[in-house]
């Protein structure tokens, strides 16, 4: 089951929330219900963003910084603005697959579990680029429809 751990983010000082298929948040006004919902949406959408980025850039290899860290940092700031206090948020997709975001010493740090990094390292540059760059265009057969 997915889980989120939030420390010192907005109105939430310390929370660990299990995330079933259906989650009902009840509480006083300004207690952090919307913040929790927005964080859950944000982290769930990262998984989709990650997959899209892996398939979107076929002309080069992939890098952790350019293909995940920088876009995630930008997206976080779009969603929540620039932080003004130290915080840490960890989202558990599974027991061993996590993404953490923390603000420490005026830096927004993004960390992911090793399994995500292994996936990125395992994505090779597409082989067809080598083929096309070494082939004369007149040698490529035309396909008529």
Regions found by a protein language model. Name each.
Residues 1-145:
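P-loop NTPase switch/coupling surface
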């Amino acid at each position: 089951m997915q889980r989120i751990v939030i420390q010192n983010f907005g109105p939430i000082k310390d929370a660990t929330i299990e995330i079933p298929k259906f989650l009902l948040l009840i509480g006083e006004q300004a207690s952090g219900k919307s913040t929790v919902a927005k964080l859950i949406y944000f982290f769930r959408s990262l998984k989709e963003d990650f997959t899209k980025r892996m398939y979107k850039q076929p002309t080069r290899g992939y890098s952790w910084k350019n293909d995940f860290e920088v876009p995630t940092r930008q997206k976080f700031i779009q969603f929540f603005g620039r932080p003004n206090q130290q915080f840490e948020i960890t989202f558990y997709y599974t027991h061993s697959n996590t993404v953490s975001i923390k603000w420490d010493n005026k830096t927004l740090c993004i960390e992911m579990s090793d399994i995500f990094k292994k996936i990125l390292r395992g994505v090779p540059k597409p082989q067809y680029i080598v083929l096309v760059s070494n082939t004369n265009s007149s040698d490529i057969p035309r396909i008529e429809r």
